[in-house]
From Swiss-Prot:
Protein localization: Membrane
Keywords (A to Z) from UniProt: Germination, Membrane, Transmembrane, Transmembrane helix, Transport
Function: Contributes to the L-alanine germination response.
Any one of the GO BP annotations: spore germination
Underlying gene: gerLB
Top-level taxon of the source organism: Bacteria
Similarity comment: Belongs to the amino acid-polyamine-organocation (APC) superfamily. Spore germination protein (SGP) (TC 2.A.3.9) family.
Main location: membrane
GO cellular component: membrane
Membrane topology field: Multi-pass membrane protein
UniProt protein name: Spore germination protein GerLB
Transmembrane regions listed in the UniProt entry: 16-36, 44-64, 86-106, 122-142, 149-169, 192-212, 227-247, 279-301, 313-333, 341-361
Length: 374
C-alpha cells in the first residue's frame, strides 16, 4: 500500500512552531519538578526555568534564522557548501546517531513509565516494541502530514496541563512557595545550565526549515522562539503547582511529580479517582510526537547524505537496531545518564554547526559583495 503524501510537502511557520513545542514537551516534563527542586530552594525553581527557557528561545531563533538563509536547501547541503563536505557529513552522521539514540531513549522511558503507572503486568520489551511500531507507522508516510499532526495534538496536551493545575487548586498551599529568593546565586548558575536541557527540542527547526514555504519563512525564527516560551510557561505552571501541593522537599523525593499531581485529583467526591491515568494517556500523545520527530529528523539527515536511499529503507533497517539499543540500559539511573550524554551531544552539534556556517557565510558575503545563497 502506497503511503499518502501531500502534493506540496511544504509547511508554514505555524507548523514549525507547533513541531518545536511538541518536541520539547516529552519525558523530561514528568520528572522536571524533581530535577529543578533539587537545584533550588522553595519555589525559586521558576527563575532557572525562565532563564533556561529564554536562552533556548534565543538559540531556537538563531538556528532557524541561519537555516532560512538557505531556502529549500537541507542541512547537509548548506553545511557542505560552507564547512566542506567531510565536515558536514561528520556532523550529520553524529546527529543521525544521536537522534536515533534519542528515539531509543524515549521509547524505553515511555515503556518504563507505562509499566509503572498503567500496564504493571506487561513486559517492558513488549511495550517498547509496540510503541516503536506506532512511531514507525507515523513517520513512514508524509513528512508534512506528521508535522501537521502536532497542530492537532499540542492543544490537547496544553489543556491537560492547565486542568492538572486547576483541579489541584484546592490542595495548594501558598506557604509552601515561601520564602522566596533563598537560593544562592552560584546555585542559580548550575540550575540554569541543567534547565537548558529541559527545553531541548528546538533544534528540529534547523532541519525542518527546508520544508518552509517562501511566504512564511521569515516568520519562522520568531515562531520557534514563541513556541519555546509556551513550553517555559507550561513548565513553570507545572513546577509551581507541584511545590504548592507537595512542598519542595517532598517534590525532591518523587520520581515523577507531574504524574503524582494527577493522583491527587478527585472529582465529584470520588466520581473520578484515576485522573492520573487519563493525564498520562494524554501525555503519551506528546511523547509520541517527540519520538516521531527525532526519528524523522534522523531519516531526513541520512537520506540527505545518501539521496539514493529511500526513507522507508532507512526506517526498516534502523528500527530493529533502535529496539535492541533501547534494551541495553539495565537500570533507570543508567538510562537517565544516557539521556544526559545525548543531550550534550545534541546541543553541542546543533549550536556549533549553525554558528560556524554563519561565520563562513558572512566571510563569503564580505568577499563576494552582494552574493546570496542559491
Amino acid at each position: 500500500m502506497k503511503p499518502f503524501e501531500y502534493g506540496d510537502e511544504e509547511i508554514g511557520s505555524r507548523e514549525i512552531g507547533f513541531a518545536v513545542s511538541s518536541t520539547i514537551i516529552g519525558i523530561g516534563a514528568l520528572s522536571m519538578p524533581r530535577d529543578i527542586a533539587n537545584q533550588t530552594l522553595f519555589s525559586d525553581g521558576w527563575i532557572i526555568l525562565l532563564l533556561g527557557g529564554l536562552i533556548c528561545a534565543v538559540l531556537g531563533w538563531f538556528v532557524t534564522r541561519v537555516a532560512i538563509l538557505f531556502p529549500k536547501q537541507n542541512f547537509v547541503q548548506y553545511t557542505s557548501a560552507h564547512l566542506t563536505k567531510p565536515v558536514a557529513y561528520t556532523i550529520s552522521s553524529i546527529l543521525v546517531l544521536t537522534f536515533a539514540a534519542l528515539t531509543a531513549y524515549e521509547s524505553r522511558m515511555i515503556s518504563v513509565i507505562s509499566q509503572t503507572y498503567l500496564f504493571s503486568d506487561t513486559p517492558i520489551q513488549l511495550l517498547s516494541f509496540f510503541f516503536l511500531l506506532v512511531v514507525i507507522y507515523g513517520i513512514a508516510g508524509s513528512r508534512a502530514a506528521l508535522l501537521r499532526l502536532n497542530v492537532l495534538f499540542l492543544p490537547i496536551v496544553l489543556i491537560a496541563i492547565v486542568l492538572l493545575s486547576l483541579l489541584n487548586i484546592n490542595l495548594m498551599e501558598i506557604n509552601n512557595l515561601l520564602p522566596a529568593f533563598q537560593t544562592k546565586v552560584s546555585q542559580y548558575a548550575v540550575g540554569v545550565k541543567n534547565s537548558i536541557f529541559t527545553f531541548i527540542g528546538f533544534e528540529v527547526a534547523l532541519f525542518y526549515a527546508v520544508l518552509l514555504n517562501n511566504k512564511t519563512a521569515k516568520k519562522a525564527p520568531m515562531a520557534v522562539a514563541k513556541a519555546v516560551m509556551v513550553n517555559v510557561l507550561s513548565y513553570i505552571l507545572i513546577y509551581v503547582t507541584c511545590i504548592s501541593v507537595f512542598t519542595y522537599m517532598t517534590t525532591r523525593g518523587l520520581t515523577y511529580p507531574t504524574i503524582e499531581l494527577g493522583k491527587e485529583i478527585e472529582i465529584g467526591g470520588g466520581f473520578l479517582e484515576r485522573f492520573d491515568a487519563i493525564f498520562f494517556t494524554t501525555w503519551i500523545i506528546t511523547i509520541y510526537n517527540t519520538t516521531a520527530m527525532y526519528y524523522d529528523v534522523a531519516s531526513l539527515l541520512f537520506c540527505a547524505m545518501f539521496p539514493k536511499v529511500k526513507k522507508q529503507i532507512f526506517i526498516f533497517i534502523s528500527a530493529p537496531i533502535i529496539f535492541m539499543v533501547n534494551m541495553i540500559p539495565s537500570s533507570l539511573n543508567t538510562l537517565s545518564s544516557y539521556g544526559t550524554y545525548l543531550a550534550w551531544i545534541d546541543m553541542g552539534c546543533v549550536v556549533l554547526a549553525p554558528l560556524l556556517v554563519l561565520i563562513v557565510y558572512k566571510i563569503k558575503r564580505r568577499n563576494g559583495g552582494n552574493e546570496t545563497p542559491s
